[in-house]
Amino acid sequence: MTKLGRFLGEHFKTVRLLNEDRVGVVAVTGRFVLLLACILSPKASAQTDHGTDYIRSSQPTLLIYTELVALSQQETVDPPLAAKLQTLLTTPFINNEAYFSGTKPLRPDVEGLGPSLRLVEWNIERGMELDDIKLAMTDKEGFLAKAHAEPNDKKKTMDKELIAQMDVFQSADVIVLNELDWGMKRTDYRAVVKELADALKMNWAYGIEFVEVDPKVLGLQSFANVKDEAERKELENLFSVEKNRVLGLHGTAILSRYPLRDVKLVPFKYQAYDWYNGEKKYGTVEAGKRKGASLLFGEEIVREVRRGGRTNLMATLDVPELPQGQVTIIATHLENRTTPKGRVQQATELLDMIRPIRNPLVIAGDMNTTGADGSVLNIKSAVVKKLNDPGWWATKGIKYATGVGLVMDLATFGFKTAKFQADPTASGVPLLAPNPEENFFDDLQKYRFDDGSRIDFRGDEKLSVNGRDGTLSNSNERAKKGFVTTFSLPRTLGEKGKFKLDWIFVKAYLTDDPKTVDSYRFAPAFARTMDDVNEALDEPLSDHAAISVDLPLSQQSH
C-alpha cells in the first residue's frame, strides 16, 4: 500500500462494513411493524400527566441516493425534493421504546445533594469509535481490561478516576450528544444514535444538522488526474460507497431515561456560514489558512459540502419532583466557521426563543468557543479586517520599527493559549490581548428570562468536584488555571492545542433576589470533565471529552 493509502486509510478509519438493512427494506419492515403494533396494542402511546401522549416512535422520510446526488450537484432542486429536505431538517426523530419497555430514571442519590438528575454532554466526533464508547458507558470491567491490554498502557494508576468517570456515564439520566452520523461510510453506515440508545436502554431524539453531500461522501469524486495507477485505484476504492446504504445524515441527539415529549428541531435563523456554497468556493486566503492550521496542529481539514445548518434540538421531560413538574433540555451546536460575534448572535437568538419558558431548563452542547475567527475569507475581506482592527494598528509600529514582532506574537499567543483557550470567560486586555469570547459569556450572565430567573453562573467551592470555585465552576469543571479543557488538537511540535469548547448552562430558580426560595434546587453541582476515559485507550474515543453535571431535585442549603 502506498503512503497516501495508509494516510487516508487511517484518517477515514476504513474498517469492516457491517451488514445493515437497505433503505427500501427498512421502509417496508417499518410499515409492517407499525401495523402489527396497532393490531396488538390499541394505543401506541401513553398518556402523561399533562394530557399529552408520549410518541412511541416517529421519524421523517429519508432521502435516497439519487436525491442526495441531486442535492450535491444542483444548488436549486425541484420543489418536491426541496420540501423533503426542509422537512428532514425541521422534523426530529423520536423514540420512546425504552419507556414502553419499562425504563425508569435512576435519580442517583448524590452525597450532599440527595436524589438528582445527572446530565452528560459529549461531542462524539461522528461516532468513529462507537464500539469503545458503548463499552465505556456500559461495561467498566471490559473497558479497563481493554485499556490495560493496549501496548502503551499507562492507565493503571488512573483506575480509580476512570471508574468514577464511567460511573457518571452509567448513572446519567440524560445524555446530550453532538456529531452523530447515520448512514455514512466513515462510520460503517451505522445509525449511531440508535445503537447507543439501545445499548443504554434509553429513549432518544435525533435532529439532523446536516445532510452530507460532498462528492467524496457520495462516491462521486473523480481521481482521473492522479497519474500513479496504484494510488488512483486505492483512492477510488477508499471513496467508493454502497449506494443503497448511504443516507448522509449528521446531527445532534438527546438520550434520556425519562420519556421525551414536545420534541422540536429548530434550526437557527442566522446561519453564520453557508456549508454548501462556502465549501465549494473558498478562496486563496482560506486555502492558506487551512494549510497553516494543518502545519500548526497537524489537523487534516477537508472540504465538507453540506445541506443544512446549525440547529437546536429541544425536548421536555416530566420530572414530578419539581414545582412545575417538567424540565426542558436544549441540545445545541454553535457554528465554528464564524467569528465569536457570529456565535453571540446565534446564542442571543436561542435565548430569545426560550425566554418564555418558566420551568427549569438546561442548554448543553459544543459552543465552539475557540476565540478564533474561523470564517471563510477572501483577500479583500482580510485586508478590511486588518484595517478595522485596533489591535493590529497598536502593534504595527513595534513589528516594523523594532523588529520584535516575533516576540510580541509569541507573547500574545502564549497569553491567549494559557488564558482564553482554557478560560474563555476570562477578562481580556484591550488592544494587547482582548478576549474575543468575552461578550458571549457577558450576555449569558446578564440575560433574564420572563419569570425573572437567570443562568446559574455561581461557583461554590463546596459544590465543585475538585474544591475549586470561580465563575461557572458549579456547572463546568475548573482547573488550577481556567477550566478543564474539552477539546484538543495534536500539534507537530510541543503539546496539544487545548480548548474549552463544550458547556452546560442551567436555568432553574435563581433570580436577582438573594432571598429567592429554592435558589439551590436543580442548581448545577459537581461538574466533571471525563477526559481520563476519553484518553484511556491508544485511540481517543473522540476529539472532545464528555462533561457532566448533577442537578438536585430538592432544595439544598448552602
Predicted regions located by residue number:
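N-terminal secretory signal peptides that target proteins for export/translocation
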Residues: M1-A27
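N-terminal, active-site-proximal structural segment of metallo-dependent hydrolase catalytic domains
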Residues: A44-T252, F268, K281-R303, D538-E539, ...
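Metal-dependent phosphoester-hydrolase catalytic domains
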Residues: Q47-P105, L260-L265, L317, P340-K341, ...
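Active-site flanking residues adjacent to catalytic metal/cofactor-binding acidic residues
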Residues: W122, N178, T332, A364-M367
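Active-site environment of divalent metal-dependent phosphoester hydrolases
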Residues: G127-M128, W182-K185, E212-P215, Y273, ...
